[in-house]
Regions:
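Catalytic core of membrane glycerolipid acyltransferases/transacylases, capturing the structured
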Residues: 2, 14-73, 81
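A short beta-turn/loop motif at secondary-structure boundaries
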Residues: 12-15, 142-143
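Secondary-structure boundary/capping positions in well-ordered alpha/beta enzyme cores
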Residues: 5-6, 42, 67, 89, ...
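Non-catalytic C-terminal accessory region of glycerolipid acyltransferases
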Residues: 77-195
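A short, glycine- and basic residue-enriched loop/turn
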Residues: 11, 27, 98-99
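A residue-level signal for beta-strand positions that form part of recognition/binding surfaces
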Residues: 5, 19, 147-149
């Protein structure tokens, strides 16, 4: 991806081994490979099942450890597979917005990631990405040369994640995680803008 001026910060926040859940803002189809590329370790993503039926995209997804999930009814099989991957020492990447941003800003988080947090005992890492929306916006079929910045945040406080994972605290957990991802995205955007 030589046409992107791609830089990262915070790689030291994500260990080179051990399972974990990586929660990322979603701007473009470029996000999954770029986030994983810098980590230099496999990241298994969850993607909506309908993408697997798109000829070229489906082949790529099946070839790269992507797990299909039905967004209308998160299947227990997909959740079990993601939990198994994390328990086996892999990172599982998820875009809690559930779709790409229309304008590059962080959108509303869907609650689907909560079951993974509740049922796993792995670190949770927020990641923010800026610039991929301009490089390949939603609905775009062309790449545009852009500066892209990715910020890997520190592991979310396990005690706070555990406290907020209790039934009835879903809105607080979503707000806590969204705030951490948005802080990483804002840092990436400021770095990209040179401010």
């Amino acid at each position: 991806m030589f046409w992107l001026r791609f830089q990262v910060r915070g790689l030291e926040n994500v260990p080179m081994s051990g399972g974990g859940l990586v929660l990322i803002n979603h701007q473009s189809f470029l996000d999954p490979p770029l986030v994983a590329l810098a980590l230099q370790r496999p990241v298994s993503y969850l993607a909506r099942d309908s993408l697997f039926r798109v000829p070229v995209i489906g082949w790529i997804l099946r070839s790269t450890c992507v797990m299909a999930i039905n967004r209308d009814a998160a299947s227990t099989a997909s959740i079990r597979m993601a939990l198994q991957r994390m328990n086996d020492g892999f990172l599982v990447g998820l875009f809690p917005e559930g779709t790409r941003s229309n304008d590059g800003n962080v959108g509303e988080f869907k609650p689907g990631f909560i079951s993974l947090i509740r049922r796993s005992n792995v670190p949770v890492y927020p990641v923010g990405i800026a610039g991929t929306h301009d490089a390949m916006p939603r609905g775009g079929v062309r790449f545009w040369p852009q500066k892209v910045r990715v910020v890997y945040g520190k592991q979310l406080c396990p005690d706070e994640v555990s406290r907020l994972s209790v039934k009835g605290n879903e809105d607080k957990l979503i707000a806590f995680v969204r705030s951490a991802v948005e802080a990483c995205k804002d840092e990436a955007q400021a770095w990209r803008d040179g401010t």
